[in-house]
């Protein structure tokens, strides 16, 4: 374990888009009052993916969708909103998650099967999908990667980020 830890180094000015071929952006689209609330991470090529999901019987629509998305072992993008969890929203919640997936895929010109979706925030409220889809159109491939970290905050007061390099 000590040898492994000695091979890990912190990158001071790094972010989610530091690895070659990765891009990210975050924007304020109106799900929250003032803060950034929508973002994505995009890879130039499909990347390996794994997931750990809740075993709770009640699972948010994005969780249900992403369980199927990761079965092929690869994703190329993830789109995330904060301010609304899209949880306990029934069939319309799953429809909205699939809409986020499809609109993101079209914006990035990739297959929807390569897009994961995540939502965090208030439970039990329908996701304002028109606001979200309009916001996806505002996201940039070469946007501000630090904005992504801001866009996924819920009640946090600071961004939680670390970038490391291993040998």
Where would I find each of the regions flagged by the language model?
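Short beta-strand segments
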Residues: 41-42, 79-81, 118, 165
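A generic local secondary-structure boundary/capping motif
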Residues: 25-31, 51-54, 66-70, 152-154, ...
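Alpha-helical support elements that line or immediately flank enzyme active sites
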Residues: 79-108
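Short, ordered loop/turn segments at secondary-structure junctions
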Residues: 45, 68, 83-85, 120-122
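Glycine-rich, mobile lid/loop segments that gate access to catalytic sites or pores
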Residues: 98-99, 103-167
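Active-site-flanking structural segment that lines cofactor/substrate pockets
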Residues: 41-74
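Short glycine/serine/threonine-rich phosphate/pyrophosphate-binding segments
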Residues: 72, 87-90, 160-161
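N-terminal amphipathic/basic leader segments beginning at the initiator methionine
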Residues: 1-54
């Amino acid at each position: 374990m000590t040898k492994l830890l000695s091979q890990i180094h912190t990158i001071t000015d790094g972010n989610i888009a530091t690895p070659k071929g990765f891009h990210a952006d975050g924007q304020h689209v109106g799900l929250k009052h003032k803060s950034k609330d929508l973002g994505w991470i995009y890879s130039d090529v499909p990347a390996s993916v794994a997931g750990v999901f809740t075993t709770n019987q009640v699972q948010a629509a994005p969780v249900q969708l992403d369980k199927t998305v990761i079965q092929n072992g690869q994703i190329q993008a993830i789109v995330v909103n904060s301010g609304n969890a899209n949880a306990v929203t029934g069939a319309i919640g799953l429809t909205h998650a699939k809409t986020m997936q499809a609109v993101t895929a079209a914006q990035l010109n990739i297959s929807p099967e390569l897009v994961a979706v995540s939502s965090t925030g208030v439970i039990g409220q329908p996701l304002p999908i028109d606001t979200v889809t309009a916001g996806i159109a505002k996201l940039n491939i070469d946007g501000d990667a630090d904005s992504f970290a801001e866009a996924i905050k819920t009640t946090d007061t600071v961004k939680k980020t670390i970038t490391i390099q291993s040998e």
